[in-house]
C-alpha cells in the first residue's frame, strides 16, 4: 500500500512540476521554419544554445515577447557552459562605460539609469534581461550608434559621419555599406511614399528623404553588427542580441552585417510576432523570416472611452 501511495505521490509531483514549467511562460506558440511545424519552447532554446550568434527580433511594444526573451536567456544559460554575452539595440555605444560600471557594482541602478539614456519601457521590458545577465556575470554590450549621429545621417546622409571628431567616430562602425539590395527594397516598401507626409515636398525630395533615412538605418545595422562580431571574437562567446525584428528578419540588416564580419559564425534568428489568436497562427507563409517564429498572444486593446 505504501509503495502504491509513493508511486502516486511521485506521479503527482511530476505532473504538477510539468504544469508549473508550462505555466512559467506567457501564452505562445513556436514555429520551427526548417522542420515546418510547431515545436516546444525548450526545443527551440536547446537549438539556440548551440549557435554562436542569436538574434531575438521583437516588436518593441509587446510585453509577452520581452518575458519570453528573458526565458530564452535563462534556457541558454542552463545549457551553455562557455562565455555568453548579452547585446542590446536599446543601449548606445557611448554609454558602455556606465553599463560596465553598473555590472561591476560601481554604480547604483539609479545612477546607471541616469547616465545611460534607457528606453522609456526599460523598467518593464528590458530590465529583467540586464539583471539576469548581471547575476550571471555576463558582459552586456551597448551596441547601437548614438541616436544623435543617426539623426545627423538621416538629415545629411553618410557625409555626416565623415565630419565626426576622432573620439566620436569610434562610436560608429568603421566600415559602412549601404547597398540597394533586398533590405533596401523591404525598407522602401515599409516607408512608402513620403511626399504626402508632413511638409509638402517634391517626389525628388521625398526620395532623398527615404534614402537618407535608409542610410541611417544601415549605419545602425553596421554598428550593431560590428559590436556583435567583436563580442563574439572574444573567447568565442555566444552573443544574444535583442533588436527590433526589422533589423534581423530574413537574415538582413544587423544579421547580414554581423555575418560579414564573422563569416564562420553559426547564427540563429528568432522573430516574435504578436497575434490575436494563437490557435490560428500559421508560420508557413512567414517561414523565410528566420529559424523560429514565436507567436505571442497580443495584449487586448482597451476599448475607447465614450
Q: Predicted regions span which residues?
A:
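Acidic/histidine-rich, surface-exposed loop or edge segments in extracytoplasmic proteins
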Residues: 26-29, 49-59, 108-114
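Solvent-exposed loop/turn segments at secondary-structure junctions
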Residues: 59-63, 91-95, 146-150, 245-248, ...
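A substrate-binding/cap region within the structured catalytic cores of diverse enzymes
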Residues: 97-231
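N- or domain-start disorder-to-order transition segments that initiate the globular core
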Residues: 18-51
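Bacterial N-terminal signal peptides
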Residues: 7-19
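Membrane-embedded segments
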Residues: 62-71, 75-85, 93-102
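C-terminal regions of proteins
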Residues: 223-234, 246-306
Amino acid at each position: 500500500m505504501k509503495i502504491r501511495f509513493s508511486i502516486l505521490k511521485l506521479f503527482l509531483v511530476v505532473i504538477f512540476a510539468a504544469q508549473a514549467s508550462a505555466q512559467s511562460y506567457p501564452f505562445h506558440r513556436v514555429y520551427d521554419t526548417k522542420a515546418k511545424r510547431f515545436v516546444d519552447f525548450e526545443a527551440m532554446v536547446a537549438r539556440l544554445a548551440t549557435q554562436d550568434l542569436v538574434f531575438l527580433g521583437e516588436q518593441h511594444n509587446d510585453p509577452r515577447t520581452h518575458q519570453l526573451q528573458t526565458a530564452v536567456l535563462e534556457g541558454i544559460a542552463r545549457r551553455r557552459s562557455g562565455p555568453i554575452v548579452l547585446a542590446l539595440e536599446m543601449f548606445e555605444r557611448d554609454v558602455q562605460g556606465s553599463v560596465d560600471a553598473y555590472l561591476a557594482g560601481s554604480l547604483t541602478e539609479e545612477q546607471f539609469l541616469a547616465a545611460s539614456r534607457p528606453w522609456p519601457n526599460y523598467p518593464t521590458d528590458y530590465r529583467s534581461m540586464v539583471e539576469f545577465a548581471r547575476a550571471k556575470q555576463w558582459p552586456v554590450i551597448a551596441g547601437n550608434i548614438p541616436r544623435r549621429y543617426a539623426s545627423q545621417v538621416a538629415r545629411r546622409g553618410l557625409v555626416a559621419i565623415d565630419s565626426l571628431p576622432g573620439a566620436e567616430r569610434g562610436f560608429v562602425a568603421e566600415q559602412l555599406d549601404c547597398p540597394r539590395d533586398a533590405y533596401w527594397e523591404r525598407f522602401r516598401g515599409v516607408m512608402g511614399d513620403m511626399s504626402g507626409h508632413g511638409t509638402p515636398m517634391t517626389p525628388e525630395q521625398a526620395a532623398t528623404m527615404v534614402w537618407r533615412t535608409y542610410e541611417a538605418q544601415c549605419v545602425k545595422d553596421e554598428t550593431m553588427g560590428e559590436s556583435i562580431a567583436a563580442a563574439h571574437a572574444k573567447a568565442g562567446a555566444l552573443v544574444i542580441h535583442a533588436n527590433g525584428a526589422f533589423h534581423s528578419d530574413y537574415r538582413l540588416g544587423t544579421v547580414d552585417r554581423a555575418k560579414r564580419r564573422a563569416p564562420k559564425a553559426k547564427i540563429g534568428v528568432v522573430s516574435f510576432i504578436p497575434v490575436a489568436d494563437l490557435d490560428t497562427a500559421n508560420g508557413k507563409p512567414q517561414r523565410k523570416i528566420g529559424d523560429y517564429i514565436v507567436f505571442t498572444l497580443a495584449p487586448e486593446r482597451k476599448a475607447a472611452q465614450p
